[in-house]
Design a protein with these regions (language model features):
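Primary mode marks residue(s) on the alpha4-beta5-alpha5 output face of response regulator receiver
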Residues: 25-180
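Bacterial N-terminal signal peptides that target proteins for export
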Residues: 2-10
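Classical cleavable N-terminal Sec signal peptides
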Residues: 6, 23-25
Length: 180
């Protein structure tokens, strides 16, 4: 299990460069905690560590998961809970660094999200070409062996799991578990 200091260090790296004042001014710690916990399954809610975007601990947990409220720059909801592998993934994605998973990683977004391109990890809005998807409650999985993803569809409208961001270092499996 990752120790708390290393977890906070990774989280600090993950959050570098984000503006926090807007979200902090609009949301109380209780609201941010509730938002972050809405991403977690019921069996983990009392076990996860929850951090706000200023790295303040809103809840200290003893599991391998760290949850965050919706990022301040996003409209709508998009809280997520990440294990250690996903924390590394998020750091790489946010800092546009190469990434190769060392282990299987699982991330929860059980409150859903407000949308992302299925093909471009850095798209900021919907276009006709970028397969914009507003996903309901879902899990995300990364794997060290990307060839395992070849058996899965890339079409987000196939009615089941699909591969997002194929042919990028940030490729992962999306597993919808509820209505969009």
């Amino acid at each position: 299990m990752m120790n708390t200091k290393l977890n906070i260090l990774l989280t600090s790296t993950l959050l570098a460069g984000l503006s926090c004042n807007l979200y902090a001014a609009e949301s109380s710690p209780k609201e941010m905690l509730e938002d972050a916990l809405s991403a977690a399954p019921p069996t983990l809610k009392d076990k996860v560590t929850v951090l706000d975007w200023e790295k303040n601990v809103l809840q200290k947990g003893d599991s391998r998961y760290t949850c965050f409220p919706t990022p301040p720059q996003l409209e709508g909801k998009a809280p997520m809970c990440m294990d250690e592998a996903w924390m590394e993934w998020a750091d790489a994605w946010m800092n546009k660094k190469p990434f190769q998973a060392k282990t299987i990683g699982i991330s929860y977004m059980l409150a859903g999200d407000q949308g992302a391109s299925n093909i471009d990890p850095y798209a900021e809005g919907e276009t006709e070409e970028n397969q914009w998807v507003k996903e309901g409650p879902h899990l995300m999985i990364i794997t060290p062996d990307q060839s395992l993803l070849d058996s899965l569809p890339v079409d987000p409208n196939n009615g089941g799991p699909y591969v997002m961001w194929k042919d990028t270092p940030y490729v992962h499996i999306m597993i919808p578990v509820g209505e969009r």
